[in-house]
Amino acid sequence: MTTIVSVRRNGQVVVGGDGQVSLGNTVMKGNARKVRRLYNGKVLAGFAGGTADAFTLFELFERKLEMHQGHLLKSAVELAKDWRTDRALRKLEAMLIVADEKESLIITGIGDVVQPEEDQILAIGSGGNYALSAARALVENTELSAREIVEKSLRIAGDICVFTNTNFTIEELPN
């Protein structure tokens, strides 16, 4: 798996992820780019799960963004509907965190769309709970920027989770 974490703080949203691709208990690649910009750089997206499945979902989600003029929630709900009803899509094993300047969402592998708690922190993947815990502690107890919190949370997850490394891709809005 992997770790993807998103933090929204002081008018900035940051999504970061590690670069490890595993096949069973073997590391296949250490520098995969699991966080991307979509919709002309206005939407950040990060994936956890099967790489091929995630790229399929990135492509489908970007189409939904185009269809709905970049409206994040509407695009996510429409993708989730397709995910639940299309036989081929139902077999995809991946989760997405998506964010724009206004909101952040998780799109789950069963076609659910989840909004964050009041703290505006999201995390997915095998190291997601470690990163989520770290980010919450840092938000509550420090004045660090959203980017610094994402970096530190990913580093903590990478130190604990064997399916997460410390080769990060981090994107932020506004940039």
Curated annotation (Swiss-Prot):
Regulation of its activity: Allosterically activated by HslU binding.
Query: A single GO BP annotation from the record?
Result: proteolysis involved in protein catabolic process
What GO cellular component entries does it have?
HslUV protease complex; proteasome core complex
Q: What is its EC number?
A: 3.4.25.2
> Which controlled-vocabulary keywords does the entry list?
Allosteric enzyme, Cytoplasm, Hydrolase, Metal-binding, Protease, Sodium, Threonine protease
Q: Which cysteines are joined by disulfide bonds?
A: none
Locate the active site. 2
Q: Where does Na(+) bind?
A: 158, 161, 164
Where found in the cell? Cytoplasm
Among SUPFAM superfamilies, the record links this protein to:
N-terminal nucleophile aminohydrolases (Ntn hydrolases)
A GO molecular-function descriptor:
metal ion binding
Reactions mediated catalytically: ATP-dependent cleavage of peptide bonds with broad specificity
Enzyme class name? hydrolase
Similarity remark? Belongs to the peptidase T1B family. HslV subfamily.
Q: Which PANTHER family match?
A: ATP-DEPENDENT PROTEASE SUBUNIT HSLV, METALLOPROTEASE TLDD
Q: What protein name is recorded for this chain?
A: ATP-dependent protease subunit HslV
Species per Swiss-Prot/TrEMBL record: Haemophilus influenzae (strain PittGG)
* The organism's taxonomic lineage, starting at the top: Bacteria, Pseudomonadati, Pseudomonadota, Gammaproteobacteria, Pasteurellales
